[in-house]
Each structure stands twice: as structure tokens, then as C-alpha cells.
Amino acid sequence: MAFLKKSLFLVLFLALVPLSICEEEKREGENEKEQEDDNQSEEKRGLVSDLLSTVTGLLGNLGGGGLKKI
């Protein structure tokens, strides 16, 4: 009976170790994907701000110097 218990524990242990490793790799993959998404959103924000500053600069040049102070 003790032999069966030891065998069962061994089988369960050997099954849980790969499961744990797979979960860890899955979490790492999700973290990498989140970082890529964050980097892409930062790039988009940078492009939008550059575009906005360029457009306002062009409109200022076309409008005769921009807004006039009152």
C-alpha cells in the first residue's frame, strides 16, 4: 500500500512540475505582449503629438503669426 502511495505522489509531482512551468511561460508571454502594446501606444502618442505640433505651427504661419494677444 505504501508503494502505491509513493507511486501516486511521484506521478502527481511529475505532472504538476510541467504544468507549473507552462503557466510561468504563459505569464511571461502575456507580460511581453503587454509591454509591446505599451510601446506601440507610446509610439502612437508621440506621432500624434508631433503631428499636432506641426499642424499648429503651419496654421500659425498661415494665419499671420498665430493668435494675437488682446
UniProtKB/Swiss-Prot annotation:
Residue ranges, annotated region (Disordered): 25-45
**Would you indicate the residue range of the signal peptide?**
1-22
* Parts of the chain that traverse the membrane: none
Location relative to the cell? Secreted
Pfam families membership: FSAP_sig_propep
Q: What is its main location?
A: secreted
Which ranges form a coiled coil?
A: none
Q: Which UniProt keywords apply?
A: Cleavage on pair of basic residues, Secreted, Signal
Specify the propeptide location in this chain.
23-45
Q: Is Secreted one of the keywords UniProt gives this record?
A: yes
Q: In which tissues is it expressed?
A: Expressed by the skin glands.
GO annotation, cellular component aspect: extracellular region
Q: What does this protein do?
A: The native peptide is a cationic amphipathic alpha-helical antimicrobial peptide with potent activity against both Gram-positive and Gram-negative bacteria. It has weak activity against fungi and shows low hemolytic activity.
Q: Which family does it belong to?
A: Belongs to the frog skin active peptide (FSAP) family. Plasticin subfamily.
Please give the record's comment on domains: Plasticins have huge conformational plasticity. They can display random coil, alpha-helical, beta-sheet or beta-harpin structures.
Name of this protein: Plasticin-S1
Q: What is the lineage of its organism?
A: Eukaryota, Metazoa, Chordata, Craniata, Vertebrata
